[in-house]
Amino acid sequence: MEPVDPRLEPWKHPGSQPKTACTNCYCKKCCFHCQVCFITKALGISYGRKKRRQRRRAHQNSQTHQASLSKQPTSQPRGDPTGPKE
């Protein structure tokens, strides 16, 4: 390995940056383009903010759905119906 000039900043070291820009392509060649491409494309690791998923909006007939819920029979109490034994 060649010695690197200590006066150079780390991002200017030879081989630290690829000669071509990164692309959005996911082919094998582009996945191994540079370390960043390998981590994000090949391994699928990204530390960016996750987009929030929008909730599904209630339909216009939500009132009829609520009405049908009230017509359902009430659930039976669980446990021993006679009460606790001593």
UniProtKB/Swiss-Prot annotation:
There is a cross-link at residue 71 (Glycyl lysine isopeptide (Lys-Gly) (interchain with G-Cter in ubiquitin)). Residues 22-37 are annotated as: Cysteine-rich. The modification N6-acetyllysine is found at residues 28, 50-51. Residues 38-48 are annotated as: Core. It is found in: Host nucleus, Host nucleolus; Host cytoplasm; Secreted. Asymmetrical arginine methylation by host PRMT6 seems to diminish the transactivation capacity of Tat and affects the interaction with host CCNT1. Residues 48-86 are annotated as: Disordered. The modification Asymmetric dimethylarginine is found at residues 52-53. The keyword Membrane does not apply. The record marks 11 as: Essential for Tat translocation through the endosomal membrane. Zn(2+) 1 binds at residues 22, 33-34, 37. Residues 48-59 have a biased composition (Basic residues). Residues 1-24 are annotated as: Interaction with human CREBBP. Belongs to the lentiviruses Tat family. Transcriptional activator that increases RNA Pol II processivity, thereby increasing the level of full-length viral transcripts. Recognizes a hairpin structure at the 5'-LTR of the nascent viral mRNAs referred to as the transactivation responsive RNA element (TAR) and recruits the cyclin T1-CDK9 complex (P-TEFb complex) that will in turn hyperphosphorylate the RNA polymerase II to allow efficient elongation. The CDK9 component of P-TEFb and other Tat-activated kinases hyperphosphorylate the C-terminus of RNA Pol II that becomes stabilized and much more processive. This is Protein Tat. It comes from Human immunodeficiency virus type 1 group M subtype B (isolate HXB2). The gene is tat.
